[in-house]
Regions:
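Bacterial N-terminal signal peptides that target proteins for export
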Residues: 4-17
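Zn2+-dependent metallopeptidase catalytic domains
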Residues: 31-170
Length: 170
């Protein structure tokens, strides 16, 4: 009987420890996602930013994460071994960087309309980083090669007038 009781006590201890660890560690893992509204889809009417939930401390982590994700998406385009096409180059580039675009749209609209010292500090810090980020994409020789292939073969693609115009100006 004693072994049976010890076994139950050990199981209860393990369950208690696991429960404690889960309850203690899970908020640490997900706290950034739960607290930063940029890291989730907007659950507002018309998907407008939830301005009442956004504060200045959300911007830098969202900008940094947005640039990281954007770089990953651009690297996927570069590493794509398929024959370059309008879809896998131009459309993929246009669709990339959605988090960065969302954060930038909110931040720069706020900085232009209701600025404060904290917003100005963030703007001063993030502007050169964004410039460098976008320059690294625009001046990337691998992206340039792929776009050049498309541009040189523009007449071989079945492009709409809009797609043709986009490619001509890329």
């Amino acid at each position: 009987m004693k072994n049976f009781q010890k076994g139950i006590i050990n199981k209860v201890r393990k369950i208690t420890l696991i429960t404690f660890l889960f309850l203690f560690l899970s908020p640490l893992v997900n706290s950034e996602v739960m607290e930063n509204p940029f890291f989730t889809e907007y659950e507002t009417n018309f998907k407008i930013p939830p301005f009442s939930q956004i504060n200045e401390d959300h911007f830098m982590p969202a900008f940094i994460k947005g640039m990281e994700l954007h770089n990953e998406e651009i690297n996927d385009i570069i590493e794509n071994k398929e024959e370059p096409s309008f879809e896998n180059i131009i459309v993929a580039m246009e669709r990339s960087g959605s988090l960065l675009s969302r954060v930038s749209a909110v931040f720069f609209n706020l900085s232009g309309s209701t600025t404060n010292p904290k917003i100005q500090e963030i703007e001063k810090e993030i502007s050169p980083k964004l410039s460098s980020h976008y320059d690294s994409i625009s001046l990337n020789p691998e992206i340039f090669k792929k776009v050049k292939i498309l541009w040189e073969n523009i007449d071989n693609f079945d492009l709409s007038l809009e797609e043709r115009k986009i490619l001509e100006e890329t």
